[in-house]
Amino acid sequence: MCVKRILSIVLMMLLLFGAADAMAKHGEKPPIKKAILLVAFGTSDPEAAKAFELVEKRARERFPGVEMRWAYTSRMIRYKLAKQGKLLDSPETAFAKLMDDGYTHVAVLSLHTIPGEEFHELYQNAHLFGQMSGGFQKVLVARPLLSSGKDMETVAQVLLKNIPGRKAGDAVVFMGHGTEHHPADAIYLAMNQVFQEIDSNAFVAAVEGNNSLETVIPKLKKRKANKVFLVPLMSVAGDHAKNDMAGDEDDSWKSILTAKGFKVEPILKGTAEHLEIVDIWLEHLKSAFTHF
């Protein structure tokens, strides 16, 4: 099955499951009160967290006057931040607080890259809160970043033009998170194809799932790449980027490629640090918000 066919199937699944619409409530409805919930896996790295600040700033410009709150899906990161005195809600806690505060319509911006396991868990929980009697009138979950061929092409073009110091013949490997045992993992394969159509020295691999770094190394050798840039295909350059990708441990991508004879230069900049990419997420949020 060709890559484009795989992408079509996966994105069709995304369209089927990409928005949680609360069931209509019977009886008298309270006045409409709208809110936006920004949801990310999360990060405990202050530098990486600046990307989320950029997203919120951009979102407030696009949706002035709308209540905005944050939620992190990672329990470990929430616990780590709590020990530092920074309290972040889980999506479920954030939904409950919004409901208690009388919000009737909630649009959720998922800062996930693909509609993988975490995205669908978020969708399912949003749907459950939307069904609760006496709660929200409507809850909609906006699509994640890579939700269409156009989104993928735009992301690829933005990332490729933001690699400082790259010369002809230098290769780039973009690190995705990956997801095991989930059909959305095929999006990384499709994204690799998108990069290849633009730049034959650009590749995608993932920390988890089927698209490992080991599948890319033979291609780097075939292309006779002298230098390899490593770039996160994640919203922030957090733990995975700083340790799994750019760390000094023997099992980091930098160390593995260096041991294979490549010169390696990591770039610690997440996708949410590029305004053109942030605007893709916000267009998805706008699409959800127009249904209110």
Positions of the model-derived regions?
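Position-driven detector of the extreme protein N-terminus
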Residues: 2, 13-14, 24
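Extended amphipathic ligand-handling, pore-lining, and cofactor/metal-binding catalytic surfaces
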Residues: 23-229, 235-292
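Bacterial N-terminal signal peptides that target proteins for export
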Residues: 1-9
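Bacterial N-terminal signal peptides
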Residues: 9-18
